[in-house]
Amino acid sequence: MSEPNQQPYMRVDDLHEHAASSSDAPKKKKKRGKWLAFFVAIGILVVCAAIAGGQFFGDTAHDGPFASGEKNVVMIDVKGEITAEGDTYNQQFILNQINEAKNDSDNKAILLMLDTPGGSVYECDEVYNKLLEYKKETKRPIYAYCESMCASAGYYIASTADAIYANRNSLVGSIGVITGQFVDATQLLDDLGVKITTVHSGANKLMGAMYEAPTEEQIAIMQSISDEYYAQFVGVVADGRGMTTEQVKALADGRIYSASQAKGNGLIDAIGTIDDMDKHIKKDVGENVRFYHEVYEQSPYASLLGGLKSAIDSRSMSSELASSVKTIEEMNITEPMYLYQP
């Protein structure tokens, strides 16, 4: 925020300086309040306009058949961190695309285009099951192409494919789970003079809170959950790749593999370009197919609203404190994640 304009000339008088500085403070407060009200008003207008136009959540696929009238292969992007909604990933958009392909009698296959470090266990398993439903009900194949990265939850989803290709520079794998990454911010809060008291019942109700150091019991609880989701991941890969659980566990220590290593270990079928993948698909389903590719784009209204929120938040605390809080929030993981996190 810019400072109020100063008078070009001032009398060097202690009393006058004191009076000027005293009257300056409420002006600053008043001006800050006006700016905050302005941002809030703009935000409300943006939300109202976006909802009225049906564009708040970004472009989404229609939950019905493409009705394309020609044989097609639907290309579905799985890009960015897998979560409910992000700049490049939208869960409902992907689920709707799968439904569209399933309901289109002219559809011949799905091609997954993967470039992701992974993400939420819930979202990736939901996509995984929706793809299995597509295969079961249509008897059509699924293919997967790994671009620069196909890690963790991304590879979990790719395991549904009948054939997995990867770019020669792709990183593949990271079969593992992060269930708890506790950030103990108690010392930071003490340094800031912040005291938090939460009234609760249940010894582990505050498990994962940044203002409570985790106990040994809580770490053991999260480890048991982590082991359960790890076993689920191993089972998914074993089913998809025709391997035993022992074979998968030998590879599933969380590490990432190069494309050549992944192929050597049976995690992918071939290394090649997207053109090579296309040729493979056409050989399976026929030459006369059109590749249908619908790209998700986040609504500009949602992006603008996010920018306004950030601007308001940054005005309410120092930039250094805001940066520290954001970093701590990103580090704290209290839900199961199939995520490659170097």
Predicted segments, located by residue:
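N-terminal organellar transit peptides
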Residues: 1-141, 149-150, 163-166, 181-342
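Zinc-dependent metallopeptidase catalytic helix centered on the HExxH motif
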Residues: 161-179
